[in-house]
């Protein structure tokens, strides 16, 4: 016991030293156990309270941390520091209390229960302490991160503030420096002006720089200077000064040249010191070199000048040239020397020879005798070798007579069937004509011009011409539309003795570059190939302008397969005493062509075509002719579906595609071609065995040219023509062609033609055979120009492309529609329904009214006046007829006639007399009435599709529903140029409504529909008299 007491004494002493309350044990075990239980329960309660308080504090700390993360203010940082210090104090106090509890644990004589409780307490205290340590570590790490973040933020703000201060300081220094430099520069300039002046021996352009610098300095001094501008000015001035000094310093060294490079200015090279003073001075160029070389204002001026020059040149071309003021150099036309063999021939022998050569007929005096071989026409050995090389063995009938006539210098009209060699007939004399003249000099135009109606024919003639021109050293240029003009201009500028052209593009070439591309001053030989077709297609004005610009003593030659009499009078205007040579009659199909005409229904045409293709296509190439571009494309698709590879050729195809198609067809790459009449002229294809007129030709000459594509150069050919009963009017021309060519006419074709003649006679119509040559070209007069301008203005206004700077403002399309409407407006006062326009008469009034009527009838019967008189006259006529007497002409007073005429005039002028208006107002004032608004819009003169757009049932119903106005169609349609008779009116729309706004809405909707249709028609405008050929 002594030891135990001593032991407890020591613990109590230690407790006393630590400042805690001392405990003493009682000698009784029972009392000690109760005390221990009470103490353990109190400790448990304390621990639970501590844990709950610690949990609350942790949660509050976590919330505080989240709030502190979002906040960056220093006040909250200080409060956080205070909270952290308090938490540290609490943790220290908790650690001291735990140390006291651990030292006050019970000895080994305690009960198991107490020991277990103490052990559980120690374990829980150990777990709590470890958790607290982890939390403390996390809090310390977070605090360090926060402190580091705050330090970085503060450091960044401090750096930014210092940076701003340095920038402001640098700007202030630069501003001061710039002002000082400007002052120094001014002083230097003044010193340079007062002292000796530097000079460049080779460059005088910089002498004005000091004055300019002084001026700039004064201007900048007068106004507030921007520091950056001042700095840049300073740099420029220093660079100039540096360049001046370097150039001045290098002036003493002879032959010193080297580039002076700076950061701002481009390379400046000094010249040799010793230079002739008469040479051109150099130029010091700054950075803005592009501005010196290019200016949009200068470009506009150039464009305007070029346009004015082009229009002026074109106007000059359209005007005839005064050849009396131009001195042309003489030239020789007559090269023909008749050989003795031909000179010995008598006139009878000549006539017999001409008859043997397919019946050559000659008109005109002084025509030479026909030749029999190439040698007799007087051509050079080079041409003779070329003829032999290309297989021309002997002259054809047209060549035997045409070549000596042209060689004699005479103008010629050559008429021969297709494939007879007309091209060689005018080419060989042309070569002889050109070789006799001097060679071309720079800037001179051609000597010979060949004009054709189509591009394909121009290319074919060019190809034929080049066979001979290469050996002769002559240059040939083909000028036609549809391709780039720049290449053709380049070829013409290089010079060419021969030009093969289409008329439209030739005029463009003559007008290009103010006439510097080419000219007609040296032209002495003019050829018009297919002349009739050229005039028929509307090229007469262009051809005449070109021909009128050529010297009057030229030699002009015309060739064609057909030459209607109507064209001959026109052609003789440009020929001088021509000789007409005709071979084989006028417009005859070659005898080598077997012609077949089939009367067939439209639906069976394609099957018959497939039958012909199956029979003939293996033997050679085939051309199928149609009348329209749309039909050509449609037939192409049908043939492709039937597994027949083919191509189409018409005026709507691009020129490059047309050239490639013709080349492929000539080479045999493609053996089937669907074409319009664009391929009917001058197209020479070898091995062409069949021509099918899928669409019947509409005139005789067209048939001859189509059939003439086959059976050329002595080969056998076949021509089939499909004709339907609806095309009976064309049967006469086909019968004529068959008869003239000696082919039997099919019976069904004769029957079709006779039925058509009988039908026309029964209807009282005269049958007219059309030659087809009724085309009309441009007149180039004021009327056409005005129409073209109106069309352009209408299109610009519709699309909103009108330029405000145009002198002639575009006519508003709405104003045009309004003027064409010829609108008539009326407002009528109508009586309200259910009301009477007159008061109900009483008995006394009825008697008086009856007496007044009888008196009025008697007066009218005596005087025959007014409307009642007309009724009385009609009654008298009726009574006279019933009694069987004669009817006398009623007498009508002048007043009645005048009133009727006045009413007609008022109706036309839409005029209501004042008397009627006052009567209507009085009637309206006496009775309840309403106004009815009426407006009439005349639509007779609008295009047909525009009329359909607003007169269809759906359109009228839609407009009525939209505007709540009644719309009716009245009047009769009258074609342009025909005026309505008395009592009739042109077709118009009558709009009626009790609301004026409804009438206006209906009119606006009708105007909108017509305007849309007019714009659509304008955008898809196609000329009605469009030719088959497209030549630009």
Curated annotation (Swiss-Prot):
Biased composition (Basic residues): 1-24, 50-73, 81-103
Biased composition (Basic and acidic residues): 26-49, 112-200
EC code: 3.6.4.13
Originating organism: Pongo abelii (Sumatran orangutan)
One biological process term in Gene Ontology: mRNA splicing, via spliceosome
Protein name: Probable ATP-dependent RNA helicase DDX46
Modified residues (Phosphotyrosine): 294
Subunit organization: Component of the 17S U2 SnRNP complex, a ribonucleoprotein complex that contains small nuclear RNA (snRNA) U2 and a number of specific proteins. Within the 17S U2 SnRNP complex, DDX46 is part of the SF3B subcomplex, which is required for 'A' complex assembly formed by the stable binding of U2 snRNP to the branchpoint sequence in pre-mRNA. Recruited to the 17S U2 SnRNP complex following release of DDX42; DDX42 and DDX46 bind the SF3B subcomplex in a competitive manner.
A GO term for molecular function: RNA binding
């Amino acid at each position: 016991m002594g030891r135990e007491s001593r032991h407890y004494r020591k613990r109590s002493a230690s407790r006393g030293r630590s400042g805690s309350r001392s405990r003493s044990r009682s000698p009784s075990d029972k009392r000690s156990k109760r005390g221990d239980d009470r103490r353990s329960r109190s400790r448990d309660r304390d621990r639970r309270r501590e844990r709950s308080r610690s949990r609350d504090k942790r949660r509050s700390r976590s919330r505080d941390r989240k709030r502190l993360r979002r906040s960056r203010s220093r006040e909250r940082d200080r409060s956080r520091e205070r909270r952290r210090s308090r938490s540290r104090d609490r943790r220290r106090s908790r650690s001291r209390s735990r140390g006291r509890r651990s030292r006050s644990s019970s000895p080994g004589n305690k009960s198991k229960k107490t020991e277990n409780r103490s052990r559980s307490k120690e374990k829980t205290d150990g777990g709590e302490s470890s958790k607290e340590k982890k939390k403390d570590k996390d809090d310390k790490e977070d605090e360090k991160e926060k402190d580091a973040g705050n330090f970085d933020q503060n450091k960044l703000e401090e750096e930014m503030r210092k940076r701003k201060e340095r920038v402001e300081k640098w700007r202030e220094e630069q501003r001061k420096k710039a002002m000082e430099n400007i002052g120094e520069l001014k002083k230097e300039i003044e010193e340079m002006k007062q002292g000796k002046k530097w000079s460049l021996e080779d460059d005088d352009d910089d002498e004005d720089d000091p004055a300019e610098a002084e001026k700039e300095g004064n201007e900048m001094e007068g106004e507030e200077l921007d520091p950056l501008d001042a700095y840049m000015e300073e740099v420029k001035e220093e660079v100039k000064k540096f360049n001046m000094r370097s150039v001045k310093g290098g002036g003493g060294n002879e032959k010193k040249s080297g580039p002076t490079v700076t950061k701002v200015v481009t390379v400046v090279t000094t010249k040799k010191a010793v230079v002739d003073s008469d040479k051109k001075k150099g130029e010091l160029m700054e950075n803005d070199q592009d501005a010196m070389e290019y200016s949009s204002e200068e470009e506009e001026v150039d464009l305007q000048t070029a346009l004015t020059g082009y229009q002026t040149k074109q106007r000059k071309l359209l005007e005839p040239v005064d050849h009396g003021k131009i001195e042309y150099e003489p030239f020789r036309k007559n090269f023909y020397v008749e050989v003795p063999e031909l000179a010995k021939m008598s006139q009878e022998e000549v006539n017999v020879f001409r008859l043997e050569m397919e019946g050559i007929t000659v008109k005109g005096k002084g025509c030479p005798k026909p030749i029999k071989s190439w040698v007799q026409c007087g051509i050079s050995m080079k041409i003779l070798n070329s003829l032999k090389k290309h297989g021309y063995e002997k002259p054809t009938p047209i060549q035997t007579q045409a070549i000596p006539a042209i060689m004699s210098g005479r103008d010629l009209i050559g008429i021969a069937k297709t494939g007879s060699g007309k091209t060689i007939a005018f080419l060989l004399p042309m070569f002889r004509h050109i070789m006799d003249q001097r060679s071309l000099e720079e800037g001179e135009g051609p000597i010979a011009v060949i004009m054709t109606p189509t591009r394909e024919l121009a290319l074919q003639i060019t190809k034929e011409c080049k066979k001979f021109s290469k050996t002769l050293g002559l240059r040939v240029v083909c000028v036609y539309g549809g391709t780039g003009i720049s290449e053709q201009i380049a070829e013409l500028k290089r010079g060419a003795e021969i030009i093969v052209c289409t008329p439209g593009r030739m005029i463009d070439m003559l007008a290009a570059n103010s006439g510097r591309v080419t000219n007609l001053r040296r032209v002495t030989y003019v050829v018009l190939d297919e002349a009739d077709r050229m005039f028929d297609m509307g090229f007469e004005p262009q051809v005449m302008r070109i021909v009128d610009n050529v010297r009057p003593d030229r030699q002009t030659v015309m060739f064609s397969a057909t030459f209607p009499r109507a064209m001959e009078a026109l052609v003789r205007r440009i020929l001088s005493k021509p000789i007409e040579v005709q071979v084989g009659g006028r417009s005859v199909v070659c005898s080598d062509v077997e012609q077949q005409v089939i009367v067939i229904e439209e639906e069976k045409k394609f099957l018959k075509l497939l039958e012909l293709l199956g029979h003939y296509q293996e033997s050679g190439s085939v051309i199928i002719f149609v009348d329209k571009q749309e039909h050509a494309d449609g037939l192409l698709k049908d043939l492709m579906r039937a597994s027949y590879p083919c191509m189409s050729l018409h005026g709507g195809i691009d020129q490059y595609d047309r050239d490639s198609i013709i080349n492929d067809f000539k080479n045999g790459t493609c053996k089937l071609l669907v074409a319009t009449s664009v391929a009917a002229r001058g197209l020479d294809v070898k091995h062409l065995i069949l021509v099918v007129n899928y669409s019947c030709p509409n005139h005789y000459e067209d048939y001859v040219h189509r059939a003439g594509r086959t059976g050329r150069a002595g080969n056998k050919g076949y021509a089939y023509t499909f004709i339907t009963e609806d095309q009976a009017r064309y049967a006469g021309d086909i019968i004529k062609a068959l008869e003239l060519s000696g082919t039997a006419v099919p019976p069904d074709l004769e029957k079709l033609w006779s039925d058509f003649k009988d039908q026309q006679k029964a209807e009282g119509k005269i049958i007219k055979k059309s030659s087809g040559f009724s085309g009309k070209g441009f007149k180039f007069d004021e009327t056409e120009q005005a129409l073209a301008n109106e069309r352009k203005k209408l299109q610009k206004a519709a699309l909103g492309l009108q330029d405000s700077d145009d002198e002639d403002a575009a006519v508003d399309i709405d104003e045009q529609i309004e003027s064409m409407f010829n609108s008539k407006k009326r407002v009528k006062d109508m009586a309200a329904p259910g009301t009477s326009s007159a008061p109900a008469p009483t008995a006394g009034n009825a008697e008086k009214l009856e007496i007044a009527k009888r008196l009025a009838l008697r007066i009218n019967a005596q005087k025959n006046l007014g409307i009642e008189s007309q009724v009385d006259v009609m009654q008298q006529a009726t009574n006279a007829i019933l009694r069987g007497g004669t009817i006398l002409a009623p007498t009508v007073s002048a007043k009645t006639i005048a009133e009727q005429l006045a009413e007609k005039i008022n109706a036309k002028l839409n005029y209501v007399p004042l008397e009627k208006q006052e009567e209507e107002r009085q009637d309206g004032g006496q009775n309840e009435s309403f106004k009815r608004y009426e407006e009439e819009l005349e639509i007779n003169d609008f295009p047909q599709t525009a009329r359909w757009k607003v007169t269809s049932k759906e359109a009228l119903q839609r407009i009525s529903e939209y505007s709540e106005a009644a719309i009716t169609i009245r009047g009769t349609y009258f074609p342009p140029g025909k005026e309505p008779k008395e009592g009739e009116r042109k077709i118009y729309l009558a709009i009626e409504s009790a609301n004026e706004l409804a009438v206006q809405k209906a009119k606006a909707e009708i105007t909108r529909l017509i305007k849309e249709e007019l714009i659509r028609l304008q955008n898809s405008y196609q000329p009605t008299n469009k030719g088959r050929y497209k030549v630009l």
